[in-house]
């Protein structure tokens, strides 16, 4: 059953980046449940193909379309938007979810690790935002929505050295979202911009950050009742379901037991 306020999105197209697992997969599923066509992209699409089959067998009214895309490569991103334009008209909702962290500190981290984080967390998000807006503009879509999955690390810096460069990229997302909101107003459009900033979410994120210390990664999720990816997906649905005159800039959400 469609959530109140979500009826207007039925059969329209949403792009979800980083849809192969965690928050991205949960968001893609939630949108398909609400009757949207969802292009879910990632570098590998096996998990997205499985999720698409699950959604179909469950009888959800929407459709999940897997698309292989390396978001660190601008040509891949542009090719994806071109394919969406030719096959599905264009993007009405853009969920910039893809993000990564590398354990590269400011004093001794590798430049390649910093570039990996910057390329995906900042540049890919910005390229997808630009292309999504242009897709909406060329079709006279005036009610689109761009949602950036940010982080509480975009609002405070933890005393944890392996997160400091990552946090800088997320502060950039905070600034980019507000800058986007201002530019959309200057363009006199009703397209909205929102970022959602979760705290600790139980995904594979900590295991990738602490890839050489799986016990430390596991402890991240064992010390409290964490958010689930579905909690963040619920926030996405809430944002999309709000009336057109309401602009939600940022949702900050933590586990109740999270201190920082």
Curated annotation (Swiss-Prot):
What the entry lists under SUPFAM superfamilies is as follows:
NAD(P)-binding Rossmann-fold domains
UniProt catalytic activity: a 3beta-hydroxysteroid + NADP(+) = a 3-oxosteroid + NADPH + H(+); 17beta-estradiol + NAD(+) = estrone + NADH + H(+); 17beta-estradiol + NADP(+) = estrone + NADPH + H(+)
Q: In which tissues is it expressed?
A: Isoform 1: Ubiquitously expressed, with highest levels in testis, small intestine, colon, kidney, brain and heart. Isoform 3: Expressed in brain, heart and skeletal muscle.
Does the record carry Cell membrane as a key word?
Answer: no
Q: Which GO terms describe its biological process?
A: estrogen biosynthetic process; steroid biosynthetic process
Gene3D superfamilies linked to this entry? NAD(P)-binding Rossmann-like Domain (3.40.50.720)
Annotated positions binding NADP(+): 18-23, 43-44, 49, 70-71, 97, 166, 170, 201-204, 208
**From the Swiss-Prot or TrEMBL record, what is one GO molecular function term?**
3-beta-hydroxysteroid 3-dehydrogenase (NADP+) activity
EC supergroup of this enzyme: oxidoreductase
Q: Which family does it belong to?
A: Belongs to the short-chain dehydrogenases/reductases (SDR) family.
PANTHER family membership: DEHYDROGENASE/REDUCTASE SDR FAMILY MEMBER 11, DEHYDROGENASE_REDUCTASE SDR FAMILY MEMBER 11
| The protein's name | Dehydrogenase/reductase SDR family member 11
**Which organism was this protein described from?**
Homo sapiens (Human)
């Amino acid at each position: 059953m469609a959530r109140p306020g979500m009826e207007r999105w039925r059969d329209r197209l949403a792009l979800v980046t980083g849809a192969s697992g965690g928050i991205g997969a949960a968001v893609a599923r939630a949108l398909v449940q609400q009757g949207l066509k969802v292009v879910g992209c990632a570098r590998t699409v096996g998990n997205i193909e499985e999720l698409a089959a699950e959604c179909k067998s469950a009888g959800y009214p929407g459709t999940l379309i897997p698309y292989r895309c390396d978001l660190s490569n601008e040509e891949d991103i542009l090719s994806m938007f071109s394919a969406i334009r030719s096959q599905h008209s264009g993007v009405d909702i853009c969920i910039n979810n893809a993000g990564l962290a590398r354990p590269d500190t400011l004093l001794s981290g590798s430049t390649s690790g910093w570039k990996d984080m910057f390329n995906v967390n900042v540049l890919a998000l910005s390229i997808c935002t630009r292309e999504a807006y242009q897709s909406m503009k060329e079709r006279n879509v005036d009610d689109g929505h761009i949602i950036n999955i940010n982080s509480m690390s975009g609002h405070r810096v933890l005393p944890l050295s392996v997160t400091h460069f990552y946090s800088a990229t997320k502060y950039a997302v905070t600034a980019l979202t507000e800058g986007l909101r201002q530019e959309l107003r200057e363009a006199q459009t009703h397209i909205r911009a929102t970022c959602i900033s979760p705290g600790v979410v139980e995904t594979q994120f900590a295991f990738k950050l602490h890839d050489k210390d799986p016990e430390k990664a596991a402890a991240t999720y064992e010390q409290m009742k964490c958010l689930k990816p579905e909690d963040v997906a619920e926030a996405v649905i809430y944002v999309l379901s709000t009336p057109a005159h309401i602009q939600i800039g940022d949702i900050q959400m933590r586990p109740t037991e999270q201190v920082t």
